[in-house]
Amino acid sequence: MERQVHPHASMLTLQFPLVGCRFCLHRLVWKWIKRVMTCSLATLLCAAEPQLLQPVGGTQDGGLARVLSVMDKEAIERFEPDTEVVFHMFNDLLRAYTHQDNVKDAWNVFIKPEDIVGIKVLSDPGSVSGTRPAVVEAVIKSLLSVGFSGRQIIIWDRRKGLLVATGYDQLAKRLGVSIAGSVDYGFDQAVYYEAPLVGNLVFGDHEFGRDEPGIGRKSYVSKLLTQKLTRVIQIHPMLNHYLGGVNGHVVGLATGGVDNSLRFTLDEDRYHEAIPEICAIPALYDKLAFSLVDALISQYQGEERGFLQYSTVLGELRISKDPVALDVLSMMEINRQRNQSGLKRHRSAFQLYRNAELLQLGVSDPSNILFERIR
């Protein structure tokens, strides 16, 4: 395949040291960053959409992010995935991404035999618009097929009850794995993100019901991540999000891994700063094996509610070690669909991914993303 890199505006490269578990970049720094940026990332991404969404070859090289895609028109029929087709799609994608001839060697690139693997899903929107159980089943069956123990696999999201409502408890029982809610697992008092923004604590938050000075300023990381899981695989759908642009991997890992995150939704700028900073906590980001986009169906309107009338069947899966690049490409596709439907594009949310790149979480500049479709 021919390799293409899209020559748009150059990338501003800034690095920030991450110290401990308090990743609070001062607002003055962010304002300075925004002033010195010479181009609008939103404009850049909108301009790059038509070319970047075409099949492109490429390999990970230097500061470039590598994203692989597989499509199959037989993967979904009347909004129902074909589990066998999806299983083969994933295995083909995994082998191609790792440049391995067999599935076992491909998994060995990411997972060690002793790892406890957490598969992060989005269950709030249900099994049609959220992470589809057929995709999760494909990943788990692939792991089991190479001898990995089901006792070392946990399907997780914020709340166990939502996993049950979406049918993940039955899937877990059938495959011999388990499910867990990060909120239900409890929170680690020693690992947290602190910001001087106080919101209303809700039931399930670690400090809920307490009335002391300083309460509500910390977002604690779940013990599921600090004490149980050693590797995380994220599987999120291509679903729009009104603050984050896409309910993808950066937003999903940050909001799924900590409590007291609703306070950031009150201010767009603060949300765009806090979400990448939370995602950068080592107990979250450092455990990522890879991220997978469930793009069997793309929903461009509705956020956590399922609206098939605002959905497009793509029959596609995408994989990368770079969650930021995946989210940027998903946002671009969602914006393309919104534009075709006469809806306003998400523009301001691109700042979230620019901030994530400044924290070295991934690549947000489309000229540094190599996108390859294997079929």
What are these regions (language model features)?
Residues 1-31:
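N-terminal secretory signal peptides that target proteins for export/translocation
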Residues 23-26, 41, 48:
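Residue-level detector of bioactive/disordered segments in secreted/extracellular proteins
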Residues 34-44:
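Bacterial N-terminal signal peptides
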Residues 50-113, 126, 130-137, 144-375:
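Extended, low-polarity segments enriched in aliphatic/aromatic residues
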